[in-house]
């Protein structure tokens, strides 16, 4: 068999296969139309999912919610044994922030949900610190023990600056700012007479200010005026 005859025979055998493969390679007319602008009256292409719905962001917000829920459970445990009205109010605000976080997540705003969850976590920690001081729970003093008033003052100063910039004078943020300021005003900063109660009030002031900052961030991300609805 000559080379030309062999080539002709091979080509003849391959033609049916090429005919079958051509639509798969080139695509159907309907597939080709997908890359073109939609004509009037036709269905628009399905949009891509927003970046905030990425699995990584959802994982982060669920992690923040889990942390807030854990601190809420611990603060609620101490609330059954303590009677501090300040701690009770902080715990109430924590529950409200946690509910707002869940609401924001259901609405698709995971960034606002994360900020609300962090606010709930800090509020629960503030309540827990006050309950522990009331019930006499303490621990060995460390570096953070004596630095607590300074850290609280730094967070409070930042909060006051943010409030001035945003012109906030009422609502939960203003309430938390006043709470943090009052708690710090009751702290004895003299190292010779500094006690665990002073440390607990400093921690509560720090977490109250941090919670207010997270509420401010949630407000900016949501734009729904939620800070006046608590």
Predicted regions and their residues:
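Long, charged/polar, soluble alpha-helical segments
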Residues: 31-230
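Bacterial N-terminal signal peptides
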Residues: 14-25
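Compositionally biased, intrinsically disordered low-complexity regions
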Residues: 9, 13-14, 69
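Hydrophobic single-pass membrane-insertion segments
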Residues: 27-29
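N-terminal secretory signal peptides that target proteins for export/translocation
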Residues: 1-10
